[in-house]
Amino acid sequence: MLTWSIIFLVVAIIAGLLGFGGIAGTATGIAKILFALFLILFVVSLLFGRTG
């Protein structure tokens, strides 16, 4: 599960860079939402991955 979380974090960072950089101006809102969502998922899986 931690592997998937890292993959999603990388995808969210790429989407964020494209959205915030002006390359895909219309996708900025979606990139912000995806970045926040996958960042939260990454932190949650990081915490539960260490305890389990």
Swiss-Prot record:
Its main location: membrane. This is UPF0391 membrane protein Avin_10980. It is a multi-pass membrane protein. GO terms for cellular component: plasma membrane. The lineage of its organism: Bacteria, Pseudomonadati, Pseudomonadota, Gammaproteobacteria, Pseudomonadales. The keyword Transmembrane helix applies. Keywords: Cell membrane, Membrane, Transmembrane, Transmembrane helix. Belongs to the UPF0391 family. InterPro entries: DUF1328. The keyword Disulfide bond does not apply.
